[in-house]
């Protein structure tokens, strides 16, 4: 069937909630993906920050094949070796103490909120359970994580949302101080806001937040669903800041393309939880954990010697050079290979034109071109994208 036929079938049978681009992708390898007609694209979105090791990395594929032939699912009534190995790996890498596995970033964030509230209530004896999150944040699409995501375009139509959430501006420590009450249980922050437009936390800000949480006995949650797993050049974005969270959430790139989420937390908080307090049927299944173990090992190699950080700096420099030619580019910002270029207008047409030229990119918050390439990206890939972007911008300028 043709690409158009498949698109027509999707429109007939699938729930129409995605504003998809008009392309049917059928194959991926490394930086490249191919559509049903055989056209090649360079992927600078990586499945929205999922394919950090590239498409179908041989080590991840081999791990999936091997595990699929052995044991796929048992439930968490039983012990499984890949889950135990992955928990150990994430604890060692993060410096935290225990891990819980689920299936997505939204589930991980929902779990983090539950764990924080249980700890503050049961151990600290403080009721209220209020969570403070940031404007421009995105924490998920469940009702609870929507309540932590203060954007009308996501929340509208889904009221009433669960109570107990408060919002403050990102990078504003004074506003955060004013928002804290004796009901505050946790502060939830993305060290680099992704969906909100690639906003990087100030170093002094995260340190001040950590001090504030220590002083007030408040749980600090870092949502690294998008900015974690090597995306910023460190395994976890918080490593750039010398600030450790009480709870860390992960997903997206953790599984190398296979759905898996994780909550990694300190022992003090873990002690507040007992059998039956939380759970999942599929979370931490052998297949997902085997894929994740392979993915983490590959990422460890990719981020060595600041390679990802240097690629990110190169990418940002090349984008900044375009500002001199095109005054409608307001700002370029990012950390590692999590990069945004803010425009003075909606970037949806830019995304479509780049697709025509063979590049997958994204626009978030209406005006921010978002670049999340696999960590295997090379300078020649970046140069090719910049040249294509230059051509598109030139057409617009005319």
Curated annotation (Swiss-Prot):
GO BP: any one term: L-arginine biosynthetic process
PROSITE patterns: AA_TRANSFER_CLASS_3 (PS00600)
Disulfide bonds: none
Catalytic activity line of the entry: N(2)-acetyl-L-ornithine + 2-oxoglutarate = N-acetyl-L-glutamate 5-semialdehyde + L-glutamate
Pathway entry: Amino-acid biosynthesis; L-arginine biosynthesis; N(2)-acetyl-L-ornithine from L-glutamate: step 4/4
Pfam families in the cross-refs: Aminotran_3 (PF00202)
Cofactor(s) named in the record: pyridoxal 5'-phosphate
Subcellular location: Cytoplasm
Binding site for N(2)-acetyl-L-ornithine: 141, 280
EC top class named in words: transferase
Alphabetized UniProt keyword annotations: Amino-acid biosynthesis, Aminotransferase, Arginine biosynthesis, Cytoplasm, Pyridoxal phosphate, Transferase
Annotated GO MF terms: identical protein binding; N2-acetyl-L-ornithine:2-oxoglutarate 5-aminotransferase activity; pyridoxal phosphate binding
CDD domains: OAT_like
One Gene Ontology term, aspect cellular component: cytoplasm
Domain of life: Archaea
Cofactor note: Binds 1 pyridoxal phosphate per subunit.
Coiled-coil spans in chain: none
Oligomeric form and interacting partners: Homodimer.
Membership in a protein family: Belongs to the class-III pyridoxal-phosphate-dependent aminotransferase family. ArgD subfamily.
Protein name: Acetylornithine aminotransferase
Species per Swiss-Prot/TrEMBL record: Methanocaldococcus jannaschii (strain ATCC 43067 / DSM 2661 / JAL-1 / JCM 10045 / NBRC 100440) (Methanococcus jannaschii)
């Amino acid at each position: 069937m043709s690409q158009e036929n498949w698109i027509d079938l999707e429109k007939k049978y699938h729930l129409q909630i995605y504003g998809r681009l008009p392309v049917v992708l059928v194959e991926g390898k490394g930086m490249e993906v191919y559509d049903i007609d055989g056209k090649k694209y360079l992927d600078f979105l990586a499945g929205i920050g999922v394919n950090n090791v590239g498409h179908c990395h041989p080590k991840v594929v081999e791990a999936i094949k091997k595990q699929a032939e052995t044991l796929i699912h048992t439930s968490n009534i039983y012990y499984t070796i890949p889950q135990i190995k992955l928990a150990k790996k994430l604890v060692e890498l993060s410096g935290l103490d225990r891990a819980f596995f689920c299936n997505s970033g939204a589930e991980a964030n929902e779990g983090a909120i539950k764990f924080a509230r249980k700890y503050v209530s049961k151990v600290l004896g403080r009721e209220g359970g209020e969570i403070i999150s940031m404007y421009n944040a995105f924490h998920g699409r469940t009702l609870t994580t929507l309540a932590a995501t203060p954007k009308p375009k996501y929340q509208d139509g889904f009221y009433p949302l669960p109570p107990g959430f408060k919002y403050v501006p990102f990078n504003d420590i004074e506003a955060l101080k004013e928002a804290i009450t004796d009901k505050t249980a946790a502060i939830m922050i993305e060290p680099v806001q992704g969906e909100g437009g690639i906003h990087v936390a100030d170093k002094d800000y995260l340190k001040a937040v950590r001090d504030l949480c220590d002083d007030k006995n408040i749980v600090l949650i870092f949502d690294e669903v998008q900015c974690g797993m090597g995306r910023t050049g460190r395994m976890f974005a918080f490593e750039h800041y010398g600030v450790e969270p009480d709870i860390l959430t992960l997903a997206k790139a953790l599984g190398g393309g296979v759905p898996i989420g994780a909550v990694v937390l300190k022992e003090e908080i873990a002690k507040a939880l007992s059998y039956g307090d939380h759970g999942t049927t599929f979370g931490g299944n052998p297949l997902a954990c085997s894929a994740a173990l392979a993915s983490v090992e590959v990422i460890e190699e990719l981020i060595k010697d600041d390679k990802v950080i240097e690629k990110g700096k190169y990418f940002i420099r090349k984008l900044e050079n375009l500002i001199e030619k095109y005054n409608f580019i307001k700002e370029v910002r990012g950390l590692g290979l999590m990069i945004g270029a803010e425009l003075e207008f909606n970037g949806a047409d830019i995304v479509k034109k780049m697709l025509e030229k063979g590049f997958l990119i994204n626009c978030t918050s209406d005006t921010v071109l978002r670049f999340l390439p696999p960590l295997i990206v090379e300078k020649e890939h970046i140069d090719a994208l910049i040249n294509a972007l230059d051509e598109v911008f030139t057409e617009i300028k005319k």
